[in-house]
Amino acid sequence: MKRIEKYLLLLIVIAISLFTLLVITNKTRYLDYKIFVMIHNIIKYNDINMVKLISDLSVILGILLSSLMALYFSKKMFLKNIINIIFAYVLNFCIKICFCIPRPSWKLTSAVGYSYPSAHTMLALVVYGNIIYLTNTFIKQRVIRIIICMLSVFMIILTGLSRIYLGVHYASDVIGAYIIALIYLLGINYFYETSNNSRKIMKNNVK
């Protein structure tokens, strides 16, 4: 990881720390509700069950696609993909337990567990982020890369919006999930890069 990337990661960590402080002190609630109302004013769609289905399937589809892509290109990448997903889920669970923030009072469907950060959103960014990484690493055709990356970004945004629309998460839960997932991906990639470099150095020393 280059020095500028380390500074960027540090700034993002500081930003999410400050943002989380605003969330746990209820400083974002007014804006959260305004965003909830705004989304419902823009997206006038009343089939809550369909939105919930889209919200759930977007993550399941992402897990399946990222796993199949990773398995196709490299068994090692498949293992990393599974580890990334499991660790992301565990990280989300730990943060939820740490802050114990209840879900919005205006939720339109049932949901269990705590609110911050959104697990669906975190997992969506992780799995579709993995798809983007695999696409840029292994697929050579530029047009196909662009299409897959654009669809992946669309699914990441759609998942977050669906959670806010359903009222099962505050907008701040979704924003926080995006930032935390981004930090997680940067951190895990740095770990993999460092591990690979260490192995190469050890092999060279043995030779």
Residue ranges and their predicted role:
Residues 11-15, 81, 85-89, 93, ...:
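Alpha-helical transmembrane spans of integral membrane proteins, capturing the lipid-embedded, hydrophobic core
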Residues 29, 61, 71-141, 145-147:
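Membrane-interface loops
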Residues 1-61, 97-99, 103-108:
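N-terminal transmembrane-helix/juxtamembrane module of multi-pass inner/ER membrane proteins
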Residues 21-23, 67-73, 163-164:
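Hydrophobic alpha-helical transmembrane segments
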Residues 15, 61-70, 132, 155-160:
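Hydrophobic, membrane-inserted alpha-helices
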